[in-house]
């Protein structure tokens, strides 16, 4: 048996092609069952996400299996051409397949280096195949090993600790400034995707008070419900600024929302007031001149980028350590699986010999019951059993002798000979 990965990812194909090769929850089992009808395919797992579609298989022959998979994909996805499959799909066999799965589950092959969401996606794919009895023992061992390696990498390299998402970086920044999140009030201006992610991250950190403001009041209300926040009407923003410790803006406004003049006025009325402004809008929503005001600190995307770059470097260093772990673990797995196959073959061989022994033993016991001569029975038993056991080795020796290479013949003899 061999292990094979056949797939497509963001590295090898544009989204216009990837979106045509996505298995839905409704058709994924049907697709895999169709593939497993082929005698050369012994087991399989389909992983289908927005960034990759991969088929992990246990197979008999690489070249036959590859032809089967290409034809299977072509038939299953009506608008997919054979040429597109050959030009954009990759394949990995045995130890390369093992290393690839370990890299995928550990987030090393992800668009965002080290992201952990892929691990749960791979687990879902594995358990789906396990539930439907579509998985072979070698594939099961491979996936279980990959999950163990992913856990080891996260534990030993801390690759997941160095987040590079803006919401997380903002929280890291605020943690450096404030002792506790439970004592600060934050206002988010804008309720788009990025501010929603920031709001959810702040909610996880148990922020004391979270205020949401947006030009469309319903959008602000919807987000506030999700994070247990309060709504501030857009035209009421400036009345509430003096109550806040942190203001984060992310809107599509092409004009400045927070000006130097407004903030100067607020600070003059509230002596010793300190406010943190974080502007992640493009174009910027906050006048950069407010940095000149005592007690005011402004952070923009450029400032956050430095933190992101720093964390990305840490991730890359962690990834190097992770690659070393995978190299060792993939070798260990291949050694283990080869040992497993060997032991299974040996068990099978010994079972056959034992079965043969029982057949002749049964015949001999029957003859003894009939009162036949015991000495003749034993001679007959050993003669027949010996002939059966040495038939194939003798044939092998004869065929080797016909090759006119005496060294091969003597090497084989030395391997087959019985030590007395």
Swiss-Prot record:
Disulphide bridges, residue numbers: none
Active-site residues from the entry: 50 (nucleophile)
Assigned keywords, A-Z: NADP, Oxidoreductase, Porphyrin biosynthesis
Marked site: Important for activity: 100
Catalysed reactions listed for this entry: (S)-4-amino-5-oxopentanoate + tRNA(Glu) + NADP(+) = L-glutamyl-tRNA(Glu) + NADPH + H(+)
InterPro entries membership: 4pyrrol_synth_GluRdtase (IPR000343), 4pyrrol_synth_GluRdtase_dimer (IPR015896), 4pyrrol_synth_GluRdtase_N (IPR015895), GluRdtase_CS (IPR018214), GluRdtase_dimer_dom_sf (IPR036453), GluRdtase_N_sf (IPR036343), NAD(P)-bd_dom_sf (IPR036291), Shikm_DH/Glu-tRNA_Rdtase (IPR006151)
Top-level taxon of origin: Bacteria
Pathway participation: Porphyrin-containing compound metabolism; protoporphyrin-IX biosynthesis; 5-aminolevulinate from L-glutamyl-tRNA(Glu): step 1/2
Binding residues for substrate: 49-52, 110, 115-117, 121
Sample GO molecular function, one term: NADP binding
HAMAP family xref list: Glu_tRNA_reductase (MF_00087)
Oligomeric and partner information: Homodimer.
Family, as annotated: Belongs to the glutamyl-tRNA reductase family.
Further remark: During catalysis, the active site Cys acts as a nucleophile attacking the alpha-carbonyl group of tRNA-bound glutamate with the formation of a thioester intermediate between enzyme and glutamate, and the concomitant release of tRNA(Glu). The thioester intermediate is finally reduced by direct hydride transfer from NADPH, to form the product GSA.
Domain notes: Possesses an unusual extended V-shaped dimeric structure with each monomer consisting of three distinct domains arranged along a curved 'spinal' alpha-helix. The N-terminal catalytic domain specifically recognizes the glutamate moiety of the substrate. The second domain is the NADPH-binding domain, and the third C-terminal domain is responsible for dimerization.
The protein, known as: Glutamyl-tRNA reductase
């Amino acid at each position: 048996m061999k292990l094979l990965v056949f797939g497509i990812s963001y590295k090898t194909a544009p989204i216009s092609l990837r979106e045509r090769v996505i298995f839905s929850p409704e058709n994924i089992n049907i697709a895999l069952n169709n593939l497993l009808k082929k005698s050369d395919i012994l087991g399989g797992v389909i992983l289908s996400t927005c960034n990759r579609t991969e088929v992990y298989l246990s197979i008999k022959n690489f070249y036959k299996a590859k032809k089967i998979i290409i034809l299977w994909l072509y038939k299953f996805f009506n608008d997919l051409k054979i040429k597109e499959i050959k030009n954009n799909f990759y394949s990995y066999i045995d130890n390369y397949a093992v290393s690839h799965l370990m890299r995928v589950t550990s987030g090393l092959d992800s668009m965002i280096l080290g992201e952990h969401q892929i691990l749960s996606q791979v687990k879902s794919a594995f358990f789906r195949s396990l539930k439907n009895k579509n998985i072979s023992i070698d594939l099961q061992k491979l996936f279980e090993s990959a999950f163990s390696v992913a856990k080891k990498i996260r534990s030993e390299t801390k690759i997941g600790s160095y987040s590079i998402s803006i919401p997380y970086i903002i929280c890291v920044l605020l943690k450096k400034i404030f002792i506790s999140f439970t004592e600060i009030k934050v206002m988010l201006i804008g309720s788009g995707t990025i501010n929603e992610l920031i709001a959810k991250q702040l909610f996880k950190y148990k922020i004391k008070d979270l205020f949401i403001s947006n030009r469309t009041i319903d959008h602000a209300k919807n987000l506030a419900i999700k994070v247990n926040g309060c709504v501030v009407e857009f035209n009421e923003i400036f009345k509430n600024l003096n109550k806040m410790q942190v203001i984060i803006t992310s809107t599509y406004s092409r004009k400045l929302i927070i000006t130097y003049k407004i903030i100067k006025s607020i600070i003059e009325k509230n002596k010793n007031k300190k406010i943190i402004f974080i502007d992640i809008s493009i174009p910027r929503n906050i006048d950069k001149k407010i940095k000149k005001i005592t007690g005011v600190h402004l952070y923009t995307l450029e400032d956050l980028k430095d933190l992101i770059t720093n964390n990305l470097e840490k991730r890359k260093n962690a990834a190097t350590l992770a690659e070393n772990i995978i190299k060792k673990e993939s070798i260990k797995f291949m050694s283990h699986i080869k040992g497993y196959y060997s032991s299974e073959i040996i068990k099978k061989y010994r079972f056959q010999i034992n079965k043969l022994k029982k057949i002749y033993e049964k015949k001999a016991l029957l003859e003894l019951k009939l009162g036949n001569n015991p000495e003749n029975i034993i001679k007959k038993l050993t003669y027949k059993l010996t002939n059966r056991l040495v038939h194939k080795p003798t044939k092998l020796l004869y065929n080797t002798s016909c090759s006119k290479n005496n060294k091969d013949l003597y090497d084989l003899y030395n391997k087959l000979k019985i030590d007395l």
